[in-house]
Amino acid sequence: MANSKRTLFLKRRLRVRNKLRKVNAGRLRLSVHRSNKNISVQLIDDVKGVTLAAASTLEKDLGFVGKNNIEAATKVGSVIAERAKAAGVTEAYFDRGGFLYHGKVKALADAAREGGLKI
């Protein structure tokens, strides 16, 4: 039976997350979710089970015109870097989930790095 795109995505997400957890135990996780219309990112403490900071194109006060493009992803990356600094976080590991490290996901990670977050 052929695997569907969704099944392949879920397998890839589990594989990536399990590899990252083995190497980065105890560190904070910068988790990305990308949909067809929006992109969001969370800074998660897996030990405590708490989200320390989050940013998304769904936030009205950030004033996104185009919500699902590289410019919006760059802005979300810089916003999460600012919020991480405000929470006292300087270092995290990047969890791309099942998404390829290309385009919007890469732009978000680069903007977070430029904002001072060590990924």
From Swiss-Prot:
SUPFAM superfamilies: Translational machinery components. Disulfide bonds: none annotated. GO terms for molecular function: 5S rRNA binding; structural constituent of ribosome. GO terms for biological process: translation. NCBIfam families: L18_bact. This is one of the proteins that bind and probably mediate the attachment of the 5S RNA into the large ribosomal subunit, where it forms part of the central protuberance. This is Large ribosomal subunit protein uL18. It comes from Ruegeria sp. (strain TM1040) (Silicibacter sp.).
